[in-house]
C-alpha cells in the first residue's frame, strides 16, 4: 500500500487491535514502543551421518544443533539489556528418523523479537555468529536463512507521544475518562509499524472482553469469539480520532493544499 502511494499526503495514522484483556467499552493506550520488531530464522547444520554404534566415524549435527540452541538462550540472559525487552524462541527442530542412525543434517528455527528495531538487528547478527561458531566447534557447517523473502522483517511499533495525547482526549470524550486505561507492551509484531516509518502513528487496544458472551479467548485461539458491541465503538472512535485531528490541524492542511 505504501509503495502504491496509499498514504498520499496523510499527516498521521491511527490503528486499533482488539484486546481480550480489556473490557468491552474500554481502550488501553501505550506511548512509545508498544509492539516488537520481529523476524523469523531457520538454520541448517550439516555434519556427516553414520551408524549410531560408531559416532567417532561421524560428525554429529544433533550435538552441534543442541549446543547452538542452548548458546542462543545466553544472548537474552547475558547480552540483552533487561530494560530493553527481547525474545529468542526456537520453535522447531528436525533431523533424522531412525533409532540407530546419526543424521547428516539437522534443521531448526524460530523467531526473534525486540522492542527496538536496532535491538533486533543486533540480535540477528549475534544469532548468526553463535550458530556458525557452535557448528565450527563441532566440525559442522551452518547455513542460516532469515526468511526475509517469505516473512519480511517487521520494525517495532512506536506510538507517537503527541498522538497519544490526542487519542487519550478523544477516548475520554467518547467513552469517559474512566474507560481509557494504561495499556501493556506486547512482544507480538504488527505491520502497522511500516506506516509509522513514514508518518506519526498510534495503535491502541480496544477491549472486547465480555465473560457473559464468552468473549475471553485471545484472537489466535480456536475458541475466539467477538463481542460485536465493539464494532460500533471502534467505528465511532476511528471517526472521532480522524475528525478531531483534522479540525485541530486544518490550518496546516489548508496551507499545504494551497
Feature map (PLM): residue ranges:
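Histidine/acidic-residue-rich, glycine-tolerant segments that coordinate divalent metal ions
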Residues: 1-103, 190
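Metal-dependent amide/peptide-bond hydrolase catalytic core
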Residues: 63-258
